[in-house]
A protein has these predicted regions:
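Conserved, mostly hydrophobic/aromatic
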Residues: 154
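Catalytic alpha/beta active-site cores
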Residues: 1-115, 119-125, 129-131
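Flexible, glycine/charged-enriched surface loops at secondary-structure junctions
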Residues: 158-166
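Flexible, glycine- and charge-enriched loops at secondary-structure boundaries
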Residues: 68, 104, 140-147
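Extended amphipathic alpha-helical segments with heptad-repeat/coiled-coil character used for oligomerization
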Residues: 168-173
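Short, surface-exposed basic-aromatic patches at helix termini and helix-loop junctions that form
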Residues: 40-44, 145-149, 159
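Generic multipass alpha-helical transmembrane bundles of integral membrane proteins
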Residues: 132-143, 164
Length: 173
């Protein structure tokens, strides 16, 4: 659900960056060595903002080799690195719950927890993604209600050192 292109080396990232000029280039997530990947993204494509899935893409969902605890440790280390770059972070956790049939409360709570952790790790700009029509049975008023609740809770964390930008996007489901 979501696709992607396998890129196998820093040289391939550099090649993509060079042929993409002047477009913005970014990447989504990895399944292991997350801190090292974040550094590669900075060095090769000058990533505009980082995206992390925190506790997905591991043994829990069958998409990676790590256990959940190790995945979280790697992501927390990566968040500290991202904070040092002063780049935004997009924690794209909620829609992964939605893909797996979770309700809107789980969606909203996971967004809030990811935002709170991001702030604690020193992230200054959070990109709050809200994937609409996920699951596909939702639409319109339901999406607006979910967005408003999520935005109200997460924006409550804002201060002079932490800003939240809403990124609504079409669903992939």
């Amino acid at each position: 659900n979501g696709g992607g292109v396998p890129i196998n080396s820093p040289d391939e990232f550099r090649m993509i960056w060079e042929v993409s000029r002047p477009l913005l280039v970014r990447t989504y997530a990895g399944t292991k060595n997350i801190p090292q990947l974040a550094k590669i993204y900075e060095e090769t494509i000058n990533i505009s903002w980082h995206a992390l899935s925190l506790w997905w893409f591991n043994k829990l969902d069958g998409r990676g080799p790590l256990d959940v605890y190790t995945t979280l440790k790697e992501h927390i280390e990566t968040m500290k690195f991202i904070a040092a770059t002063n780049k935004p972070l997009e924690p794209n956790i909620p829609h992964h719950f939605a893909f797996r049939g979770a309700d809107d409360v789980t969606y909203i709570v996971s967004a809030y927890l990811a935002a709170k952790l991001s702030k604690k790790m020193g992230i200054r700009t959070l990109i709050l993604q809200n994937m609409l029509n996920t699951p596909r049975s939702t639409w319109g008023i339901q999406d607006l209600a979910k967005s408003r609740a999520m935005l109200k809770l997460v924006k409550g964390l804002e201060d002079q050192n932490f800003k939240v930008l809403l990124q609504p996007r079409a669903g992939l489901d």
